[in-house]
Amino acid sequence: TYEILIGEARASEAIRKTEYRTDVIGSNTRLAGASLEMIDLPGREGRLRKALAEVQKDYDFIFIDCPPSLDLLTLNGLSACDSVLIPVQCEYYALEGLSELISTLKTIRKKYNPYLDIEGVVFTMFSLRYNLTVQVVEQVQKYFGSKVYKTTIPRSIRISEAPSYGQPINFYEPKGKGSEAYMDLA
């Protein structure tokens, strides 16, 4: 993605086929410095949108996985998409981050992407064994109402382990609760 954002490669050149029936434009450690390098580039907030326009017609959906920080990379992702699915960890600081994200989404709608919509909100690290989960769910449902998905992603060590084995959860533990939850979400 780094090469695409700074103009060294086209999206069509960066696409990789996977064994999971999805195409991926991967990331690497060079992406970490992209925000700084893009500061002086013209149209820096719309570079991903422009790059993806070339391949958009070839796909029904393009998913952009943004980092949790609200930096230039996230700004590019949100400027390039039609809607956002907000994962909310059932933890206290997630509410603070959510408040910042909502403010950022309003700014992006105003300045860069008037079509940006909130597709929905999905709870992650969900466990009713914790009072905090119930509190977070109540607060988020109060604000987002019907945008909150019924599907929740459970707190699970298997979900945490899967990436370290280079596998999505539905391959790492296909019959597990985490895998089933992600399949329900899809």
Name each region found by the language model.
Residues 1-186:
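P-loop NTP-binding core
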